[in-house]
Amino acid sequence: MPLEVVVELQIRAISCPGVFLPGKQDVYLGVYLMNQYLETNSFPSAFPIMIQESMRFEKVFESAVDPGAVVDLLEMWDELAYYEENTRDFLFPEPKLTPSHPRRCREVLMKTALGFPGIAPKIEFSTRTAIRECVFLHRNRFLEERHESRRPLSTSHEPIFPLNTIKMKLKENNLNRLPKGMQARAPSQYSTRHFFQDQPAQLNLGNNFKISGGSKPPFVVRHVDSAKPFGENISEHHLRRSRRKSKFSDFPFPTRRASSLDSLAANVKVIKEPDERIVLRSDSSSCLDSSQFGKSSSSKQGDADFHGKASFATYQHSTSPGPLDQPLLRERFHPGSQSTWKNIHERVCSLLTSHRAQLHQNKEDSTSEVNYIIERPSYPLKKYSLHEQRYF
């Protein structure tokens, strides 16, 4: 089993009374022990030199089996020849201090000891030296300590978290506060404002708030103008989907988008579609009371584009019924809505006389459908029985 020798050398001072060195350069002490060479730091050349340093030497003797064999190996030291030279002359032997060619072989004669038999041996070798710039580690450490000293010290004892964790937490909190329809997008200022305009009804969430996926208004008003007065790129599918889900609850923002006829001018297209909920109502007429239909008809406004501002006031006292409790088409034209039809009639007439309507007189489809809206009767419609289905 190999043995390891560990030597710890402590150097306290070097004294030489009455001696003054002619040179004023710094001096150091070098120790060579067990094939290892260590040096001390540099000190001023004035005796006594107080060093106060320690050196550690380690060596493994693989062939030793006991400490006595190690002692014998330490005594086996016979110096035959040596060569001593300063580092400058050893690396740059030329007078002009120019490095020798890397492939050029150098030859130096060694000095023999007293017991060496024969002439001095000669060493053949070559050296290659490079001087390059490097980073001074002590200087960087000084700059880092100086930079850390300028930082303000925190007096709070709370745990410190990284900055990205706080943002993620804020993002997660913001996403939890918003509806599910907006969580797929980044919570930027523009996206939040865009969501408020598209789906204003989902912002005021109550305890009994429910979104029925089967709700479908009988009339769909689409914006077919290519000029896009609001300057927003809105697809037809997204516009139709947002109007299906809009129920205009107590919305605090004065949003007036395509739900107002002031922005549509003469480019209004009315598409008549049957109400699928009438079929469900006719099948379940035996278990539902007609008095419930009258209560819900005054509060529900199917077409958000034709009922604009009136829907904000009428939906305040309404609840969220199921798919079977949706109002019938004929109940939407209750005698109480006569004033609404008058307002629509006056607004459409003002749209036709506007400058925008005169620019689009060449569009036959838009003109014919607007005339169809004007010629519709403003008198209240009759109440039909539950089993009748009528489409307007």
Swiss-Prot record:
Region span, Disordered = 286-305
Annotated source species: Homo sapiens (Human)
One GO term of the biological process aspect: spermatogenesis
Q: Name one GO molecular function term.
A: myosin light chain binding
Which keywords appear in this protein's UniProt record, sorted alphabetically? Answer: Phosphoprotein
Superkingdom in the source lineage: Eukaryota
* Residues with PTM Phosphoserine: S260, S263
One Gene Ontology term, aspect cellular component = sperm head-tail coupling apparatus
Which protein are we looking at? Answer: Spermatogenesis associated 6-like protein
InterPro entries assigned: SPATA6_fam, SPATA6_N
- Biased segments, Low complexity type: 286-301
